[in-house]
Amino acid sequence: MKFLLTNDDGYDAPGLDALRGAVNGNSVTVAPLEHQSGCSHRVSMWGNPLEVTEKGPDVHAVSGTTADCTRVGLIHLVEDVDWVLSGINQGGNLGHDIYLSGTVAGVREAAFQGKPGIAFSHYTRNGNALDWERAGGWVRRVLDHLLEEPLEPGEFWNV
């Protein structure tokens, strides 16, 4: 199974590293060059060319939003993607937050492009440290179940 990974916290975010470890294999990362939290489903328009920089093997940084990253990844960088995964976001994306979330926008754009997606977020209480290794383990367990569940065109999961 081939995954396109993205997020809204930047290509070098610890949550994205944990997600990469959870899929353990056939993935390409296309994520924002800079932090894009709260960018919602904003996309770059005409006269604003996006720059794509290779940051490592199968890791690309885009000078745009999470939705831009998903679109660029699916259209220009990665062929035959089975799933788009976004996250692991630092903070929850619950209720109305999903409309503001760049993390969720990454998989919403995947749904617009005809690909299934899952957005992952790590809720924590103020002052508590995030355990990315543990979060990656939970993502792996959730993936084992959700990847077997069929999604209708235009649908995605938010975990």
What is the meaning of each model-derived region?
Residues F3, P14-D80:
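A cross-family phosphate/adenosyl-ligand binding-site feature
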Residues L5, S86-G87:
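Redox-cofactor binding/interface segments in oxidoreductases and associated redox assembly factors
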Residues D9, H35, T65-T66, N89-G92:
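Short glycine-rich anion-binding loops that position phosphate/pyrophosphate groups of nucleotides
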Residues V28-V30, H60, L85, P116-F120, ...:
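Hydrophobic/aromatic beta-strand patches that form the interior of the parallel beta-sheet core
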Residues G73-E79, A105-P116:
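Alpha-helix C-terminal capping segments
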Residues G92-S101:
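Glycine/threonine-rich flexible loop motifs
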Residues A111-N158:
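Glycine-rich, Lys/Arg-enriched anion-binding loops that position phosphate/diphosphate groups
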